[in-house]
């Protein structure tokens, strides 16, 4: 263990002596500011290269691999994978924009358009009582059987 410490101490002394000799040769008298500046610039260069690598995209651009179909030729790639549930699907033109409803509700809404807004609630109830009869809808045909069914 002592030999290891002596060896390290000798290396440190040799490095200091070499540094002093280098200072004497260059004439800067122990001022190592130029060396630290170069080391700092070199360190900044390494960090900048690392920053560039970290900011780079995870896969190479498609122009590097023209056989896969980059911008030069082939089908364009999708920019982003999308969920099946969030994609917009075109609706067929035969479907109307109005919500689906039974005949009774359709005739109620049609009739309510002719009534003033402050009387619509009362008119709605009276219309249902008058028109939701077995005479108008025999055996309940045309009426919803349960909530949510049209």
From Swiss-Prot:
Alphabetic keyword roster: Developmental protein, Differentiation, Glycoprotein, Spermatogenesis
Any one Pfam family match given in the protein's UniProt record, by short name: SOTI
Keyword Glycoprotein: yes
InterPro entries found in the cross-reference section: Soti (IPR031397)
Glycan attachment points: 131
Family, similarity comment: Belongs to the male-specific scotti family.
Known role: Post-meiotically transcribed gene that has a role in late spermiogenesis; required for actin cone progression during spermatid individualization.
Protein name: Male-specific protein scotti
Species of origin: Drosophila yakuba
